[in-house]
From Swiss-Prot:
Subcellular location as annotated: Cell membrane
Transmembrane segments: 6-26, 35-55, 69-89, 98-118, 122-142, 154-174, 186-206, 211-231, 247-267, 281-301
Domain EamA: 17-142, 166-296
Any one cellular-component term (Gene Ontology): membrane
Superkingdom: Bacteria
Organism: Haemophilus influenzae (strain ATCC 51907 / DSM 11121 / KW20 / Rd)
Protein name (database record): Uncharacterized transporter HI_0878
Keywords: Cell membrane, Membrane, Repeat, Transmembrane, Transmembrane helix, Transport
Pfam families registered for this protein in UniProt: EamA
Membrane topology, as annotated: Multi-pass membrane protein
Length: 306
């Protein structure tokens, strides 16, 4: 693989910005459209676009191989559909900056599953990173502990957000197994098609007609975001080291906070400012530091000589 650091960084940054801005746009659409319908449109547009691309490149997955991996693909579809639905639903109860802080639970969930299923070893840097993640989350929610005392609107949103991040691990593990026979784009195509089929009975297509001009713009962006985010992510991995791309991706929650402030500044009537105190901002930074340490800590911490 030819290294192109500048292009790799650019695509990784586009990915982080796309994923960071997504919940802000989603929240606008959710005021008119239910989560199932939004998710179906996102999946079907991504699936059709990717199908056309792979057909043009003559790289469509072989049917025989697809049948061999049907059960694994089903697990992945369940994980991805649940992730999209739970994350979108959480925005009905909590603000985007809170929903996005849980994104790193997915990567740590993958690490733990790697230890339990594939017998991989958890490095010291990953253990410290996990510790920082927990500390950071505690700081982030420093003024919200009372909200977790019972099942209320806020705690419901948090439960949905955490559930969405953790269930994504099922997709991540399925993808890891399927990479033995398919490339990443072929896997995404199969997952997108499977998810679109799963959500079709639940989608209410008439809700598109009820979108306001702002909600329509946000809706179109949400649909394109899947292609922009995952497409840029794939291009970044083709041009730059995985560990370096991962570091940039850890900035997603910070971009969500930044974009929330920018959106509120330009249109306070439509976009709410993040309700975070100074300790919460520190907590968000600590969460990101924990994720960065987990991604590249092996290069920062001294190795033992054997």
């Amino acid at each position: 693989m030819k290294q192109q650091p500048l292009l790799g960084f650019t695509f990784a940054l586009i990915t982080a910005m796309a994923w960071g801005s997504l919940p802000i746009a989603l929240k606008q659409v959710l005021s008119v459209m239910n989560a199932q319908t939004i998710v179906w449109y996102r999946f079907i547009i991504a699936a059709v676009s990717l199908l056309a691309l792979l057909a043009y490149k003559k790289q469509l997955p072989e049917l025989m191989k697809v049948r061999q991996y049907a059960w694994i693909m089903l697990i992945g579809v369940i994980g991805l559909t649940s992730n999209f639905l739970l994350f979108s639903s959480s925005l009905n109860y909590i603000e985007p900056s809170v929903a996005q802080i849980f994104i790193h639970l997915s990567s740590f969930g993958m690490l733990i599953c790697g230890v339990l299923i594939f017998k991989e070893k958890l490095g010291l840097h990953q253990k410290i990173g996990l510790f920082l993640l927990l500390i950071g989350l505690g700081l982030f929610f420093n003024d919200r502990f009372d909200a977790f005392a019972g099942l209320n609107q806020y705690s419901t949103g948090v439960i949905l957000g955490v559930g969405g991040a953790l269930i994504w691990v099922a997709y991540g593990m399925a993808q890891k197994l399927m990479l033995r026979k398919f490339n990443s784009q072929q896997i995404l195509l199969m997952m997108y098609l499977g998810c679109a089929i799963a959500f079709m009975p639940m989608a209410d297509f008439s809700q598109v007609q009820e979108l306001t001009p702002l909600a329509l713009i946000c809706f179109i962006y949400c649909c394109l975001n899947t292609l922009i985010g995952y497409g840029s992510y794939a291009e970044a991995l083709n041009r730059w080291d995985v560990s370096k791309v991962s570091v940039v991706i850890t900035l997603v929650p910070l971009f969500t906070i930044l974009f929330s402030h920018i959106a509120h500044y330009f249109s306070p009537a439509d976009f709410a400012a993040p309700e975070l105190n100074n300790i919460s901002y520190i907590g968000a930074f600590v969460v990101v530091c924990g994720a960065i340490l987990s991604a590249i800590g092996h290069k920062l911490l001294p190795h033992k000589n054997h």
